[in-house]
Amino acid sequence: MKNAKFKIILLLLVMFVLVSPSFSQIPGEIVLSIQNGNDEMLSSYFNQNVELVVENNDDVFSKAQAKQIVAEFFKANKPKQFSIIHQGGKDGARYAIGSLVTSTGTFRVYFLLKSKDNNSYIHQLRIEKQG
């Protein structure tokens, strides 16, 4: 009986360790949307207001305004490749830093996600030209 309880507890611990990293990961759809230049998918993760820094735009914008600015950016800078360089976070907030290679050059991408009602929302997005 004790052996069975031990196995159950051990199994639960292993499952917890395997599952818990996925909660701290950046949603794959965000990475794909940046990689593919899909403003529609990316904006579905925008908070109602987004602090946005993209080219000459640097302000807090509504979700709709931010979507339009990002759409214009992707139209002018066709994405070729995107990869996450670093990510981290704590207490319901996560961030990622990535490198976006486009038809016009390479950009550093930073975004901050906060969780609300078990969903992740982008509160801050920065896309800045490198070099």
Regions inferred by a protein language model and the residue ranges of each:
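Bacterial Sec-dependent N-terminal signal peptides
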Residues: 1-27
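Short, aromatic-enriched amphipathic alpha-helices that serve as compact interaction elements
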Residues: 25-38
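Short solvent-exposed beta->alpha transition segments
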Residues: 28, 46-81
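Solenoid-repeat scaffolds in large eukaryotic assemblies
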Residues: 41-43
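A mature extracytoplasmic/lumenal domain signature
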Residues: 46-48, 56-58, 86-88, 99-102, ...
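Surface-exposed, charged secondary-structure patches
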Residues: 68-106
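Short beta-strand edge/turn micro-motifs at domain boundaries
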Residues: 106-131
